[in-house]
Amino acid sequence: MPLIIPKNLPAYDELQQENVFVMHQERAMSQHIRPLRILILNLMPTKIVTETQLARLLANSPLQVQVTFLQTATHSTTHTAPEHMKAFYKTFDEIRNERFDGMIITGAPIEDLDYEAVDYWDELCRIMDYTKENVYSTIHLCWGALAGLYYHFGIPKVHLDKKMFGVFEHHVTRPSNPLVRGFDEVFYAPHSRWAGLDRAAIDACGDLRILAESDTAGPMLLSTESGRQIFVIGHPEYDKYTLDKEYKRDVKAGKPINIPCNYYPEDDPARDPLFRWRAHGYLLYTNWLNYYVYQDTPYDLTHLEALEK
């Protein structure tokens, strides 16, 4: 089954050209299937790029998936046209009485700020609190994962002297967990961040399980025992050239930035980068939709039970 998105969403045409199975609302209704309802809080400045990246991965499933995009009301984007936001995004007040099978909270390039200094932090806390009663399983990505771990479990972030930037080798630590079913024992994932996690605080937290980690980049995939809260410290949704664009953007702006590790052949930015994480990016989201959303969510979302810690 396909991903259900508005026909005029920019990602629709791009994904169709890639032969990704997407469907507009009118066609989906004719199938008489209850789609999985996925809410995406898009905190990235590059809204359309992130929409396309996540839609691409969510569409790689036999399940019918309907996406709702969410924006913060307390912070307005300056990188995306207001017309786009008005056409495709809702605010928390508009959806707070709805329930969803799953949710994705994206990252944001604001690791240098204390959480309480983020202008939409209070609103984000209300949204994360909302997920505990109104969403079955929530994936938190990169900064969204750091913020979620801090809000739900008090895990502090650690500022890095050098940006964790590149594609790093990871190993699966709990191969029996359904979220990493089918993963190779060693796999690659991209990172692009100025902050990490306090490993001692994670180990001291009895509610969290590390499912995959890197000797260089640290814990990459964490989950609660129930799988209702998942934290991805990285960017498996990134496409082939995302790190390339970030690197060349920062070089052009004169910012201190190293060549992304393990990305360009022979570390030569003039050469085409290696795309080594695509399969596991798809597999992560397919496993999430199948094992933690589809198989466990009640057909009638009004019967959704609140999260118990």
Annotate each predicted stretch with a short phrase.
Residues A73-S76, P109-E111, Y238-K240:
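Feature marks short, surface-exposed loop/turn motifs that line or immediately flank catalytic pockets
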Residues T50-Q53, H79-P82, Y115-E116:
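Short, glycine/acidic-enriched capping/hinge loops at junctions between secondary-structure elements
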Residues A73-K86:
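N-terminal beta-loop-helix "entrance" segment that forms/cooperates
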